[in-house]
Every structure is written in C-alpha cells, then in structure tokens.
Amino acid sequence: MKNVIRTPETHPLTWRLRDDKQPVWLDEYRSKNGYEGARKALTGLSPDEIVSQVKDAGLKGRGGAGFSTGLKWSLMPKDESMNIRYLLCNADEMEPGTYKDRLLMEQLPHLLVEGMLISAFALKAYRGYIFLRGEYIEAAVHLRRAIAEATEAGLLGKNIMGTGFDFELFVHTGAGRYICGEETALINSLEGRRANPRSKPPFPATSGVWGKPTCVNNVETLCNVPAILANGVEWYQNISKSKDAGTKLMGFSGRVKNPGLWELPFGTTAREILEDYAGGMRDGLKFKAWQPGGAGTDFLTEAHLDLPMEFESIGKAGSRLGTALAMAVDHEIGMVSLVRNLEEFFARESCGWCTPCRDGLPWSVKILRALERGEGQPGDIETLEQLCRFLGPGKTFCAHAPGAVEPLQSAIKYFREEFEAGIKQPFSNTHLINGIQPNLLKERW
C-alpha cells in the first residue's frame, strides 16, 4: 500500500488534515493559508470574475452528476433587483458506501465555510444553509463551532473583510430521508414541507428556497473553490491526469484489506486505488464486481478495473462515476442477495410521490426475495428487466428510481446465471443459489 504524502500542490482538499484526525480549527487553518482564497476573491475580484475563474478551471459537481459548477452559478439571475438569494450546501450524505463529505466536515470544517463564503460572494447570496444529514452529529458540532469562530473573526456576518458584503451561514440538520439528496426535495424539507422533489422548471436558480433564486452545491464541490481562487486556474487543471480538472476523493469499501478514501487526481485507475491504496482483496477472497460510485450505480466487472476514474470513461463503460467511492464485491457474495438488499433500501427511501417508483421498487424486492429463496417463477427475470425499463430515466419526477434500478439491471446483465438459479425447477430439488451450492432444498411443489 502506498505511503501517501499530502502537499498543497497535490492534495488541495486534504493537505491540512491532522495525523491525529482532530478537526483543524481557525488559528491552525489560517496558519496553513486558510481564507487566503477568500481574501483574494472578496478584495480583488468581482462576482462575475469569480464565476468565470471557476468555469475556466473546469470544476464539476462532486455530488455525482458532474455538472459544470461555473455554468450552474452563471444560471443565477442577473437582475440586481432580485437581491434575496440563497446558497445551499447539500450535506445530506446518505448514499450507501459513501462517506467523503463526512471527512471534510468533521476534520476540515473551515474549508467548507471558506468555500461557501467565496461562492456566496460570487452568487451575491446573503444567506447560506448547510443541509446536514441528521446522523452526522459530530459534523454538526464542528461546523457550528467553525461558523462561530469565523463570525467572531469577521469572516462571516456583516461587512466581511471590510468589503461591505454580508453573509450569514446556518446548519440545518435533516430528519433521515435519503430523498433529500435531490436538490428540490432538500429545498422542500428546509422550508418545512414534505420532502418530495419539485417539478422542473422552474429550476432552483430562478425559484428555490421560499421562491427566491437558490444555488445548491455539494460539500466537496464547495471545498474545491478556495484552492482555485488561491492558486489559479492553470494550476488546478494541471494536477489532474484527465480532462476532468482537479482532484477527487476516491476510495474502496467492501472486504478489502485497507478500506478508505484518498484524494487522488482524476484519471487514476480503479485498479490503482484497489491494489495500491486499498491493498487488494482480503486473503482468500477473489474479486468479482464493483460499483464505481455508491449503491446507485451500475455494477462493473474486473475487466473494467483499468478504466480511469473520470466521468466520461466510467459512463462509456455503462455506469456512473457517482461519488467515486467504489464498493468491491467478492466471490462469496451472491448477487441476488446483494441486489435485494440494495433494492430494499431504495424502496424504503422512496418518497412515494411517483407511482412507478412507489409501486415498482417494492415489486422488484418481492421478486428478488423469491429468487433468493429459490422460489422464483419462470418469467421473473424478464419482469425485473421490464421494471428496470419502466423505472428508467424520464419515467419519474426525479433520479431516485433510475438510480435504484442501475445495480439491478447491471447485475442481471453480468450475473444472469445467479438469478436463473433462483427459479424453481420442477424436476430438480438442488439449486445454485447466489453462486454457492447449498444443501438439498426441500421440494416445494
């Protein structure tokens, strides 16, 4: 496993991390060039110049979609009369297998505060909210202390750095709903409404929180902004090994020797992360499959491990980069059981607004449970494939259902024999269940 040496030039997000994993508070953060990007932005650049720099740097959203951050910012209204604007940080990190934002908020809370300060100035937003996953109790404590420190130091509040710019920042904890990761459901929840997605248009940039222009960005996205302003566009583009600029928090979980996450340049291959950083599979286990970016991404196989971790390459392979925290599956894990577990989560977390999602996901779970018990019926696999089509992109209000069926459709594609083994056979009472030969099963016919 590689010995990681973090420097400001190669690890703009994580170089300030302490070895004892304690949070970096204001004095230490400022001693390590903290708020230098904010100083340059607020005292030397106009809001439009900041938006242009972020756009030119090629910063893409780190929440999974990979949309241009600068372009998203430029969609905010130019009308100066619309002077009530909001900046929302989507910190509702509930994707199974993903924990990157938690690291940043717990150990580098001032990095997020600085990123939001610069972003708010660029967007002309006077108030910001960090919508935080309710279970992230330690992150909430650390963020609130960081906000208090920044306010006392004149880095938040009124007339910041003597520029006349005012910005207040608040932490709002969620109530444990996965769907709040969708930006309009997050806005509804923040307003005290039912957490279901809104119809688009209007988009949040024109009508968001309380009907006002609103920009929603992910934690890691906002944490990239200070380094771009402090070090420049060219530097940010050059630290990547890909046409996707910058670095990304990437990692592997599952039964690997050293599960974790690391800040790596875009273009690093999945095999490098698995073998050089995560240490490979545990002794006695064979690699079987992986999900590149969390539970809601398509499975890929060992043949795809040499792909660079970047949005386009993973997309062309039939999956999504997502959060870039991959989950490794070993040969002892049955795909039917694994997918059933994932679909149970997604079915439970559906907001119930759309009929296909509300009824289709529980239906898939019912079929998967039958296949897992060896009691599947002929045609069940075809029904699952049909459900994947019915729940695909454009069939529901938001991307919850399309993301939910990605692991299902890809598991059937690559491991169909494991699903076929769960179909009840009238002339045999032995089955290959989930890739493992069990004892004789009792006849059920």
Curated annotation (Swiss-Prot):
GO terms for biological process: cellular respiration. Pfam families: Complex1_51K, NADH_4Fe-4S. Its EC number is 7.1.1.-. It is an enzyme of class 7 (translocase). [4Fe-4S] cluster binds at residues 351, 354, 357, 398. One of its GO terms (cellular component) is respiratory chain complex I. The keyword Translocase applies. Binds 1 FMN. Its cofactor is FMN; [4Fe-4S] cluster. The keyword Translocase applies. FMN binds at residues 174-221. It comes from the Bacteria. Composed of 13 different subunits. Subunits NuoCD, E, F, and G constitute the peripheral sector of the complex. This is NADH-quinone oxidoreductase subunit F. The gene is nuoF.
